[in-house]
Amino acid sequence: MRSVRMRAELDGMHVSGAERVIPHYELEKVVMELLKRPKRYDKIVITIERVENLETIPKSLPIKSHDFADVEQAHEFVIKKLKEIGIEESITQKALKLLTEGPNPKGGNMRGAVLMDPVSGERLEPDQERGIRTTRIDWRNRTAIKEALRERGIKKFYLERLIDALAIATKNIHCGVIAEICWSDDPEYTTGYIASKEFGYIRIKPMKEEHTPTGGRVYFVKRESLQELIECLERKVMLIEQLL
């Protein structure tokens, strides 16, 4: 097996990323697919690694979807769901504000996720400009998962984003993330999600206003197991067997 990761930049800013965990004989086809994925870039990096140890996750998080009239209502729903699992409104508000304004201390977005203490709201990631990236995750049979999502009524426009985001969220919860809030930094894509072990993966629209270039991820995590969690998110290679 091989881990293949793509990262694209434009004017020094991260604009696209994707990855696969695949048999070696699919390498050429998958690399070509990843090269075509960014719309615009002036730098693209493809990283290919041999996989020595592979773990499996039996099933993905269950998927639900909610559409709201505006961002305010969507964020109120996020606050409500996270409060149900013990995260206070003030902490969730801080996370939402970070993603709305841009979580990078120097302004704008980060390549990785914010790690946030769910009690104090303190940021825990070692590098607040880089964040923590969930990598080395894919589906055992990506084609079958796509077809299953199509049969559930997921439109083609959302399909690639959903299949990647669901894989990341599933690995996050498997590694020990308590809950996640995420939306894209793509100015034209307003759908985001929240995820946890308790309520699964909930797609939410709109999580931000149209034409807004900020976004990212906040992971609520336990301070006590931080290093073990980071190692799991960034280094362990995993495949998800089935869609729940």
Swiss-Prot record:
BP GO annotations: biotin biosynthetic process
InterPro entries: BioW
EC category: ligase
Pathway membership: Metabolic intermediate metabolism; pimeloyl-CoA biosynthesis; pimeloyl-CoA from pimelate: step 1/1
EC number: 6.2.1.14
Cofactor(s) listed in the protein's UniProt record: Mg(2+)
UniProt KW keywords: ATP-binding, Biotin biosynthesis, Ligase, Magnesium, Nucleotide-binding
Catalytic activity: heptanedioate + ATP + CoA = 6-carboxyhexanoyl-CoA + AMP + diphosphate
GO molecular function, one term: 6-carboxyhexanoate-CoA ligase activity
Annotated family: Belongs to the BioW family.
The protein's assembly and partners: Homodimer.
HAMAP family linked: BioW
Its job: Catalyzes the transformation of pimelate into pimeloyl-CoA with concomitant hydrolysis of ATP to AMP.
Protein name, per record: 6-carboxyhexanoate--CoA ligase
Organism: Hydrogenobacter thermophilus (strain DSM 6534 / IAM 12695 / TK-6)
Gene: bioW
